[in-house]
Amino acid sequence: LEELYFQFGRYLLIASSRPGNMPANLQGIWHNNVDGPWRVDYHNNINIQMNYWPACSTNLEECMLPLIDFIRTLVKPGEKTAQSYFGARGWTASISANIFGFTTPLESQDMSWNFNPMAGPWLATHVWEYYDYTRDKKFLKEIGYDLIKSSAQFTVDHLWHKPDGTYTAAPSTSPEHGPVDEGVTFAHAVVREILLDAIQASKVLGVDRKERRQWENILAKLVPYRIGRYGQLLEWSTDIDDPKDEHRHVNHLSVSYTHLRAHET
C-alpha cells in the first residue's frame, strides 16, 4: 500500500507538470469547473512547493521545469513588488500567484496570513535543487543563477540589522498562522537556504566573490533557531507556542521535512 501511494504521488506530478506547460496548481488538472476553491491558483506559502518535493528526489527532474519556467515569469512583476513594498533589489512574490504575474499581497485581506515576503525566495530554492540533482552547469549559468542571485539580493535588503549585530527577517509571518512578527523561524529557514544556495551557485560558476562574502557574513550573523519551554522549536521570535494548537500549517518545521537545510553541512 505504501509503494502504491508513493507511485500515485509520482503519477499526479507526471500528469500535471509537463515540460512546456504550466506547473501543478492547487487542484492540478482535475478540476471540473471553470473556477474552483481559491481560484485554483498557485499558493506560494507551501502548496506549490509541496507539489514539487517529489520531483527531483524521485527522479522526475523534467517535471521541475514547468515550475522553473513559471518562476521566471514572476521575476519582472516581482521586481516591482520588491521595490514598491520593501524598497529592495531583486524580486519576490507573496502568498498567491497566477499565470498573469501576480506577486503582491492581497491588500484587502488580513496581513497575518496574507503577508509572506519569503514566498519568492522559497520558490527560488527549487532552482538550486534542480541544479543540485542534475548538475546541469549550462542551466545554472544561463538561467538558474540569475534567479537565485536576485532572490538573495531581495532577501539581504529585507533583513533587519539589529543593534546587537545580528540579522533577522522583519516583518515576517509564519504562513497562515499567528501574528506578524520579528524573525519567525520559517522566514529564517528560507533565508538560510537561499543564501546557502547563492553562495554555492556563485562558487560553482566562479563569480560574485564580493557579494558571496556579504552573503556568508549575513548567514553567520543570522538570528539562530530557538528552543521553547516545551522543548519545541519556536515558531515565532518569542515563546508563545500553544501545545493545544492543532493548526494545519507547521512551516517552521520545514527544515526537518523539506529540502531546506537547518544549517550548512
Enumerate the predicted regions with their spans:
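Acidic/polar, glycine-enriched structural segments that form the non-catalytic walls/loops
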Residues: L1-Y42, E61-A82, G206-R209
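Acidic, His- and aromatic-enriched active-site or binding-groove loops in soluble protein domains
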Residues: V40-I48, Y52-S57
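Conserved small/polar residues in nucleotide/adenosyl-binding loops
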Residues: T258-T265
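Hydrophobic (often cysteine-bearing) scaffold residues that line and stabilize catalytic clefts
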Residues: E2-Y5, N47, L60, M64, ...
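Active-site lining segments of carbohydrate-active enzymes
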Residues: W53, N59-D132, K210-Y257
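The feature captures the catalytic groove of carbohydrate-active enzymes
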Residues: N25-N44, R89-E142, S150-N217
